[in-house]
Structure formats: structure tokens, C-alpha cells
Design a protein with these regions (language model features):
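Ser/Thr/Pro/Gly-rich low-complexity, intrinsically disordered segments
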Residues: 2-9, 13
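PRPP-dependent phosphoribosyltransferase catalytic core
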Residues: 23, 27-29, 152-197
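Short Gly/Thr/Asp-enriched flexible loops that form oxyanion-binding sites at enzyme active sites
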Residues: 85-94
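Short, glycine/charge-rich flexible loops or terminal/linker lids adjacent to PRPP-binding catalytic cores
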Residues: 97-139
């Protein structure tokens, strides 16, 4: 018998069934927390530890697939760079297109760009001008929501190109940084929610 995936009861669980054995795993078990990095008082949540474990990676992708299973959409947009890692398998599994949102100068064709605020200064994100067609329904995927600035800028670019953002998905959320506040008009979901910063 193969493995079947079912969304768990909470936002951060995926239930795996193997034969008659029912195994519940929490995705956060795969995240290594590093205290006092990059500065004292900060707990750094290392998402790369999810990627290094085959079960952790599968749980992360299955979590994202569960978030979009009832969503009607055409395109996945992934934010540079870990949004590529998590967004591409979702697009592949569901037979959807994948569009990379990149930093300036990385896309070879004509682009549209949006500047957004960072903690110290500003950043810019770009999409190919022809990557989203008017009327297309878009799911945006990224690894982490902190302040929400990057994904807010991507959503605005999608809308500028005539697309509709129907869902935004994250593997991890740092709720203390209030990134959701910038994304209130969108349907936002996170696999893991940490209450702190």
C-alpha cells in the first residue's frame, strides 16, 4: 500500500497513512531553531533543515498542496529564492504553470517591477511582463512571511498584469512581525505559525 495524504486537524499538520498505521507528524519538528542569531534575543528558524530531510520536505509540499486543493487557479508564482523550491513542486503536481518572481536584473525579457520596504531600506521584485495573462488566477508561494513586503509587492505586480491573486501560501509565518496585516485582502495560509519574531 502506498502513502495517502490528508490534511490534519490543525493548520500545521499532515496525516500520513501507511497501511493501518496512522502517523501524525508536525512539520515544525523538522525546523531547527537557532537562538541569538543573527543578534541576541532573536530565534532564527532555519527552514533549510526541512529541505534536508526527505520526510520534512514531503510534509512541506503536502501541506502546500492541501492549502490549494480546493482553489481554482492557473499559475503558481514563487518568490525568489525559496519560493521556487516550494512553488515548483506544487505547480508540477497540479499541472499548473510556474512563474518566478525575481530580484532586479535576473529576468532576461521585458519586466514589470515593484519596490517595497525592508527593515533597513528598500527592495525590488520583478516579473516578466508576459508571465501573467489578464484573467489568470494566481497562487503565490513563499517559504516565509515576516513583514509581508515581498509578497505584497508580488501580489500588486500580478494585479498590474491583470491577474487575480486567489491564494497566498507560506511554509512558515513569524506572526509577531505582522506580515498578514499587509495581506488582509487576500486568502493567506501558513503551514507553521510562530507567535514571536
Amino acid at each position: 500500500m502506498g502513502k495517502e495524504k490528508n490534511p490534519g486537524r490543525g493548520k500545521n499538520r499532515i496525516e500520513l497513512k501507511k497501511g493501518t498505521i496512522n502517523i501524525m507528524k508536525k512539520l515544525e519538528e523538522y525546523v531547527i531553531s537557532i537562538p541569538d542569531f543573527p543578534e541576541p534575543g532573536i530565534i532564527f528558524r532555519d527552514i533549510t533543515s526541512i529541505l534536508q530531510d526527505p520526510d520534512g520536505l514531503k510534509l512541506a509540499i503536502d501541506s502546500l498542496l492541501a492549502m490549494v486543493k480546493d482553489v481554482d487557479f492557473d499559475v503558481v508564482v514563487g518568490a525568489e529564492s525559496r519560493g521556487f523550491i516550494f512553488g515548483t513542486p506544487v505547480a508540477y503536481a497540479l499541472g499548473k504553470a510556474f512563474v518566478p518572481a525575481r530580484k532586479p536584473g535576473k529576468l532576461p525579457r521585458e519586466t514589470v517591477s515593484m519596490e517595497y520596504a525592508l527593515e533597513y531600506g528598500t527592495g525590488t521584485i520583478e516579473l516578466h511582463k508576459d508571465s501573467i495573462k489578464p484573467g489568470q488566477k494566481v497562487v503565490i508561494i513563499d517559504d516565509l512571511i515576516a513583514t509581508g513586503g515581498t509578497v505584497e509587492a508580488i501580489a500588486k505586480l500580478v494585479e498590474e498584469l491583470g491577474g487575480e491573486v486567489v491564494k497566498i501560501c507560506f511554509v512558515m509565518e513569524l506572526a509577531g512581525l505582522k506580515g498578514r496585516d499587509k495581506l488582509q485582502k487576500y486568502d493567506v495560509d501558513s503551514a507553521i505559525i510562530y507567535e514571536g519574531k
